[in-house]
């Protein structure tokens, strides 16, 4: 069985936690990591690691001294990525993004997220977005991929400067780039 088919089956089986039927496209990977700076991004936090597609792209865009902390609720996905990505900059945490702040002891340069906000409660969404905003350094980004524009207003209420991009793919993938300016 091909890797792509295995991934599709794994994602479909876990649809409520992945929010996707397949891995993100190369275009999404490039766009969502656009604001990671090789010079200034020292700490990047990823929500929803899945099988590590975005994780690999994030690592490609980080400098050698940077750290990536990736959160994933699915133990099998954590094991898979731990077995397939060998990079000292990567720390994998098998926990919900709701709890991310208890693992941090410094400000964050970038958040990269693919978690399905459509399947989270209002309380969970509020906790994640508000704590992410508080944890971000000034002029830093929270970038999110979703299959709908529906949640964009939730991001606009919290972040200072917001942009939504439709990459014209099928299924439709939207990238939200949300910046903390202060």
Regions found by a protein language model. Give the residues of each.
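Class I SAM-dependent methyltransferase Rossmann-like catalytic core
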Residues: 3-36
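A short glycine-rich, Lys/Arg-flanked "PGG" loop and its adjoining helix->strand segment in the class I
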Residues: 126-138
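Conserved beta-strand signature within the Rossmann-like core of class I S-adenosyl-L-methionine
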Residues: 139-146
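Glycine-rich SAM-binding Motif I of class I
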Residues: 52-56
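Conserved SAM-binding strand-loop segment of SAM-dependent methyltransferases
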Residues: 88-97
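A short acidic, Gly/Pro-enriched loop at the edge of an enzyme's catalytic core
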Residues: 102-111
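Conserved class I S-adenosyl-L-methionine
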Residues: 41-50
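Conserved SAM/SAH-binding beta-strand->alpha-helix loop
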Residues: 74
């Amino acid at each position: 069985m091909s890797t792509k088919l295995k991934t599709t089956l794994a994602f479909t089986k876990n649809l409520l936690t992945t929010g996707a039927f397949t891995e993100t496209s190369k275009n999404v990977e490039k766009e969502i990591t656009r604001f990671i700076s090789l010079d200034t991004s020292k700490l990047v936090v990823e929500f929803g690691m899945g099988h590590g597609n975005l994780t690999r792209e994030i690592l490609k865009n980080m400098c050698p001294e940077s750290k990536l902390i990736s959160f994933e609720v699915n133990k099998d996905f954590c094991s898979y990525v731990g077995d397939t990505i060998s990079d000292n900059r990567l720390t994998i945490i098998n926990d919900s993004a709701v709890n991310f702040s208890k693992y941090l002891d410094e400000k964050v340069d970038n958040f990269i997220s693919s978690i399905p906000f459509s399947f989270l409660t209002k309380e969970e969404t509020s906790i994640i977005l508000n704590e992410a905003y508080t944890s971000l350094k000034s002029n830093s980004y929270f970038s999110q991929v979703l299959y709908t524009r529906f949640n964009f207003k939730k991001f606009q209420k919290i972040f200072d400067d917001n942009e939504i991009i439709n990459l014209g793919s099928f299924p439709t993938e939207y990238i939200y780039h949300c910046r903390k300016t202060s």
